[in-house]
From Swiss-Prot:
Changing G77A: Decreased binding to crotonylated histone H3. Decreased binding to acetylated histone H3. It comes from the Eukaryota. Residues 202-265, 322-349 have a biased composition (Basic and acidic residues). The gene is MLLT3. There is a cross-link at K339 (Glycyl lysine isopeptide (Lys-Gly) (interchain with G-Cter in SUMO2)). One of its GO terms (molecular function) is histone binding. Residues 357-368, 414-429 have a biased composition (Acidic residues). One of its GO terms (biological process) is regulation of stem cell division. This is Protein AF-9. InterPro entries: AF-9_AHD (IPR040930), YEAST_sf (IPR038704), YEATS_dom (IPR055129), YEATS_domain (IPR052790). Changing F59A: Strongly decreased binding to crotonylated histone H3. Decreased binding to acetylated histone H3. Transmembrane segments: none annotated. Changing Y78W: Does not affect ability to discriminate between acetylated and crotonylated histone H3. It comes from Homo sapiens (Human). Residues 1-138 form the YEATS domain.
Length: 568
């Protein structure tokens, strides 16, 4: 019984504001009136059940409900704010209502009064026959095409909780040129409804002549917000020709209450398409262009920064204990290859080989994924793959191919000088190149015991401890250690000077014993000791540290722990 065509109706949201001749005792400087109506005085009561205005919480009875026309609220105040407006439909099915975040801005003294109008086009797709008749009675257009739905679905699909926050920033961006206010008003309008019809919201602002006001212009001295509800002197009638006033960013009493209880709208039911604002020429040049641009940049940069914090966070850099805070950001582990790919591509655009082709051995997140799998897959307790000459080659059961070739190349180079080997090994295999180019990745701590820091960070083998937790901070933590024989002078600095051959042999042996260590209380002691040095890196599944970054005192303590475990 549902009609197959879409019906479009229009709503006009607007407000008027003027400076009072004399401020009230509460300090209110403006009288304002906000309204919802049909275009050209069409009777929207046919399909509108009620309109709810959510005023700022400082007003008495901030929730104002209008069940009959005129749907308007008149008040006095001294600053603008974002005013959520909910229009409830006389519809037995969804959508039952739509919500708009309206920017009720005021103006500076000495400028023309605000006379602002914003048009909303709501397109209901396949309404019920009963609701369709109501829409048509109110002047709905039954022949409206639905081609705009795709372009505006993002607006309609935003949840109303997020819309209030986006509207506050977008409303500030709408405070200048005519082109900017259409985009701001489109993002500040959000929908609240649920299912079977799609409402396309075409949203225009026809503002009048005006003056957009400076951010700081409306900040009254801090005063109590206990406002008495004052009916303002009546404004000019609603059908008066409209003038536009430029929107004032952030002129709120405080922050409007976000109405976040709305259900998440279905973009297939109601779409709200934004149109261009129509404005009369303003009497003075807009003064808020720079504000509007900066607000847009702030909004954009905040979202970019959020993405970058996940996509290019430095989980691969061994710094100091400051890196511990990365444990809290668990989501960076879930980013997987995306994080590494974006980080690498920033450093060396498309010159890197695809990570999928190189088995991702240098990807810490992939290591972590492998480690979680191989807890069940790998029966061998010492499953540490290594890129060095020491006797761990048989344990390379997971990472093969290019990694094995690195190990062989390095095996033949073991007796050369450190500085020479660093240069030679830069070209050992394709897998090393992303690490060398990545710069910050060359200091990734991993399980390597006989290679320069670049190739060892490329191989980044893992050792899997038993499932019970080794650390207080995380449940299934895995210990990763690295004791390179050859290392780049620019990458690591050893406190007691260059490692001599004997000391490095000790480190290799220490590494081997650490990899076979199974006593949990000893492992916990080691973790506690390394934590004191600050030379470690924690991921969701591993506790990584570099033996060469530790001083000899700490190394001796590690050896003593292992001696204890050997005798026990």
């Amino acid at each position: 019984m549902a009609s197959s065509c879409a019906v479009q109706v229009k709503l006009e949201l607007g407000h008027r504001a003027q400076v009072r001749k004399k401020p009230t005792v509460e300090g209110f400087t403006h009288d304002w009136m906000v309204f919802v109506r049909g275009p050209e005085h069409s009777n929207i009561q046919h399909f509108v059940e009620k309109v709810v205005f959510h005023l700022h919480e400082s007003f008495p009875r901030p929730k104002r409900v209008c069940k009959d026309p005129p749907y308007k609220v008149e008040e006095s105040g001294y600053a603008g704010f974002i005013l959520p407006i909910e229009v409830y439909f006389k519809n037995k099915e969804e959508p039952r209502k739509v919500r708009f975040d309206y920017d009720l801005f005021l103006h500076l003294e000495g400028h023309p009064p605000v006379n602002h109008l914003r048009c909303e086009k709501l397109t209901f797709n396949n309404p019920t026959e009963d609701f369709r008749r109501k829409l048509l009675k109110a002047g709905g257009d039954p022949n409206r095409s639905i081609h705009t739905s795709s372009s505006s679905s993002s607006s309609s699909s935003s949840s109303s909780s997020s819309s209030s926050s986006s509207s506050s920033s977008s409303s500030s961006s709408s405070s200048s040129s005519s082109s900017s206010s259409s985009s701001s008003s489109s993002s500040s309008s959000s929908t609240s409804f649920s299912k079977p019809h799609k409402l396309m919201k075409e949203h225009k602002e026809k503002p009048s002549k005006d003056s957009r006001e400076h951010k700081s212009a409306f900040k009254e001295p801090s005063r109590d917000h206990n406002k008495s509800s004052k009916e303002s002197s009546k404004k000019p009638k609603e059908n008066k020709p409209l003038k536009e006033e430029k929107i004032v960013p952030k002129m709120a009493f405080k922050e409007p209450k976000p109405m976040s209880k709305e259900p998440k709208p279905d973009s297939n039911l109601l779409t709200i398409t934004s149109g261009q604002d129509k404005k009369a020429p303003s009497k003075r040049p807009p003064i808020s262009d720079s504000e509007e641009l900066s607000a847009k940049k702030r909004k954009k940069s905040s979202s970019e920064a959020l993405f970058k914090s996940f996509s290019s966070a430095p989980p691969l850099i061994l710094t100091c204990s400051a890196d511990k805070k990365q444990i809290k950001d668990k989501s960076h582990v879930k980013m997987g290859k995306v994080k590494i790919e974006s980080e690498t591509s920033e450093k060396k655009k498309s010159t890197l080989p695809p990570f999928d082709d190189i088995v991702d051995p240098n990807d810490s997140d992939v290591e972590e994924n492998i480690s979680s799998k191989s807890d069940s897959e790998q029966p061998s307790p010492a499953s540490s793959s290594s890129s060095s000459s020491s006797s761990f080659t048989p344990s390379q059961t997971r990472q093969q191919g290019p990694l094995r070739s690195i190990m062989k190349d390095l095996h033949s180079d073991d007796n050369e000088e450190e500085s020479d080997e660093v240069e030679d090994n830069d070209n050992d295999s394709e897998m090393e190149r992303p690490v060398n180019r990545g710069g910050s990745r060359s200091r990734r701590v991993s399980l390597s015991d006989g290679s320069d820091s670049e190739s060892s960070s490329a191989s980044s083998p893992l050792h899997h401890e038993p499932p019970p937790p080794l650390l207080k901070t995380n449940n299934n933590q895995i210990l990763e250690v690295k004791s390179p024989i050859k290392q780049s002078k620019s990458d690591k600095q050893i406190k007691n000077g260059e490692c001599d051959k004997a000391y490095l042999d000790e480190l290799v042996e220490l590494h081997r014993r650490l990899m076979t260590l199974r006593e949990r209380h000893i492992l916990q002691q080691i973790v506690n000791l390394i934590e004191e040095t600050g030379h470690f890196h924690i991921t969701n599944t591993t506790f990584d540290f570099d033996l060469c970054s530790l001083d000899k005192t700490t190394v001796r303590k590690l050896q003593s722990y292992l001696e204890t475990s050997g005798t026990s």
